[in-house]
Amino acid sequence: MLTKIAVEKILERALMGYDLSPQEGVVLLQQTEPEAIAAIRATSDTLRHTQAGDMVTYIINRNINFTNICEQHCSFCAFRRDDGDVGAYWLDSAQILEKATDAVRRGATEICMQGGLNPQAQINGKSLPYYLKVVETIKQEFPQIHLHAFSPQEVEFIARLDGLEYADVIIALRDAGVGSMPGTAAEVLDDEVRRILCPEKINTATWLGIVSTAHKLGLHTTSTMLSGHIETHEQQIGHLEKLRSLQQTAINQGYPAKITEFILLPFVGQEAPKPLRRRVGRDQPILSDALLLGAVARIYLGNWIPNHQQSWVKLGLAGATEALVWGCNDIGGTLMEEHITTMAGALGGTCMEVETLKTAIASLGRPYQQRNTLYQKVNS
């Protein structure tokens, strides 16, 4: 009974516009009673309506994972290869341009580009010139396209190999034509989790520092969480708390850029390396867990990060559509191709036609609208 009263009080506070404390967030995630979960869902849906409106947005974009050759060995990753391995690939400029050309022809406003950390991706012994060449290859041909490219991990990789400051790398990428930074490589922003999941990746403080630097330098970022593996409810809320604090800094300090959206990425373990797969004990995400976490994320972050999305690649289109009544206001993008999650064994597919996304949204009786990367309306 006490818990029921506690949940009601927490949800009441959220509906009054207050930010939840970490303890309150954990209480919501711990709920298992259908009645409590239904109340959390309803609150997240009301807050979504208040903070983001009823319009469901989507983006026409293409994903380009330009190489899967990677120096790191994250315990969840089925995408990476060593150079010379079966299935290793590294796209050249012509192949990247071909994909970009196809994307523009199909109406894309955004190209999302990320890849493995390939130490050979250099020009004259330096990494940054290689990355700048990739950017310039696309921007010279298609100056109008928005490049959403290179995660905080890739920024650290370039800076480390070339002996540069993170800010120098971000400025160079920005000036070459990168329009925003994916908030990936966050996984869970908890160093205890990271030691098991991705011990070679940047630590929590470095990820937060690089993203905050991007905001200071006028580069908007997204934010993500890889959920449903070894992390606890406390660690999930700790992650959301760090993102909220990061966004509060960007807004309160008057930085020229900030976090544009929060994307939940439920863990897909089907093809993941065996030790983690065994530990997690399942191959596909549990939809009910992802929906509850997404609803709590809306309640926890929504005052500061109003745009929320769940991944149809990971949850399937039906799951991502259902998430639209669990706090989400965006259904994501067309992608056109996607390798990282698909190689992990996801069943959601890699390409979604605009009409399919529209039909899914319309099935809920909600209006839809094409947007760009920064959530500005696109007249389609």
Curated annotation (Swiss-Prot):
Its cofactor is [4Fe-4S] cluster. Its EC number is 2.5.1.147. GO terms for molecular function: 4 iron, 4 sulfur cluster binding; 5-amino-6-(D-ribitylamino)uracil--L-tyrosine 4-hydroxyphenyl transferase activity; 7,8-didemethyl-8-hydroxy-5-deazariboflavin synthase activity; iron ion binding. It comes from the Bacteria. Pfam families: CofH_C (PF19288), Radical_SAM (PF04055). [4Fe-4S] cluster binds at residues 70, 74, 77. It catalyses: 5-amino-6-(D-ribitylamino)uracil + L-tyrosine + S-adenosyl-L-methionine = 5-amino-5-(4-hydroxybenzyl)-6-(D-ribitylimino)-5,6-dihydrouracil + 2-iminoacetate + 5'-deoxyadenosine + L-methionine + H(+). Keywords: 4Fe-4S, Iron, Iron-sulfur, Metal-binding, S-adenosyl-L-methionine, Transferase. The keyword Iron-sulfur applies. Residues 56-303 form the Radical SAM core domain. Pathway: Cofactor biosynthesis; coenzyme F0 biosynthesis. Catalyzes the radical-mediated synthesis of 5-amino-5-(4-hydroxybenzyl)-6-(D-ribitylimino)-5,6-dihydrouracil from 5-amino-6-(D-ribitylamino)uracil and L-tyrosine. Belongs to the radical SAM superfamily. CofH family. Consists of two subunits, CofG and CofH. This is 5-amino-6-(D-ribitylamino)uracil--L-tyrosine 4-hydroxyphenyl transferase. It comes from Nostoc punctiforme (strain ATCC 29133 / PCC 73102).
